[in-house]
Amino acid sequence: LRRAQLLPFSTVFFMVTAEASYAAVAEAAESALDGYLLKPFTPSALFERLSLARLRKVHLKPIFDAIEQDDFKLAASLCAERFEARQPYWLYAARIGTELLLRLGRHAEARTLFEAVIAARALPWAKLGVARAQIESGQAQRAITTLQGLIGEDASFADAYDVLGRAQVELGHFSEAIETYRTASELTPDS
């Protein structure tokens, strides 16, 4: 719904499910959800999660408004400012900002922001982002090294295999890419 621009960013969008498998959680994380709530849950847990998600929406409203206006440059700039000032939800803003920078083709800036996130906190999504920026800037071999390190830390990180396969294709290593994509599909069979 978000990708089709049918659901505004100001709307809090949660998935409520009894499915707790890694594949289901990974698939939900790839979608544009604000949260994932496992059943059973208490009313107070639901209230707390929705309240926190709504608070995040309020803090990041200028960023979401810029995205909805297709002003990705402004949105990326607002994300970088929030990250640098360590304002509330600075890591969340950095994640949005890096995606916007990649979309805008500003790969070096995206990589710099990903690396700043890693320096602040070693988060897997930031390391994955460094690899994506490396591929986009023609450094597929360096991306493979980055991704192999990430997979070494967490062999169940399906997105890392997906990006690794892309890097292998870029280098013409098609048989390796097929095996890598096979591993990714085994980790997330329902996606």
Where are the language model's segments positioned?
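Residue-level signature for tetratricopeptide repeat
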Residues: 61, 65-69, 100, 133, ...
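Flexible loop/N-cap segments at domain edges
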Residues: 108-191
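A Lys-centered signature of the CheY-like receiver
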Residues: 39
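Start-of-helix register in tetratricopeptide repeats
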Residues: 57, 91-92, 125, 159
